[in-house]
Amino acid sequence: MTPIWQMSKHPLEVKGAASEKRWAQPRDEIFQPTPTSIAFIAITTGGKTSQMLHVTDRLFNVMDRIVIFSHSHRLDPAWHDLKKRIADKMLKNGENPDAQKFAFESFKELPRILSEQRERVQAGKDRGDKHLPQLLILAADMLGEMQGNKMLSSVVTRGRHYGVSLLCDSQTVRGIDSQMRKNLAGYCLGRLSAADSLPRQ
């Protein structure tokens, strides 16, 4: 079976709406249209972080800002290369990655980050920019903090209106808030525990 990040065309031939022309789109049709939201679900050591990073790589060039929320981003070497790429991109855009943090261990800064994104999108609309700025949020290893998180649920349900995409992971399907589960654009499933299954919609 071909991994989703190696597929160049969406198997269902999904076409974006005219309004989605506001956002730059990735080259791979499988990840169109952005903004998007994808959950990566598998048991521990099931490859969730690896798959999330592969998808991030395919979306990287169309995102103006990438923010990481992870309890393990300092310890897990899998994040090091991405954090360096983000810092380099910020420097290229005249931003200081030391002053403008992009990696966090809790969702405390999420409201501020979303507020800033709304302001950037509105400024782009006021200028008449061809493409509006996009934000990619990575929520990894945050099990327990995604349940009942209304702010994160709003990203899934309304984030597309202000250019916010979300990639999140969980060891179980039910580790993700029910409102998020109902509205995610897609799932990437690895090996699940015997007691776990996809909920009926």
Residue ranges with predicted function:
Residues 30, 43, 86-88:
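Basic, amphipathic N-terminal segments that precede the first structured/catalytic domain
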Residues 24-27, 35-60, 64, 71-75, ...:
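Conserved P-loop NTPase motor cores
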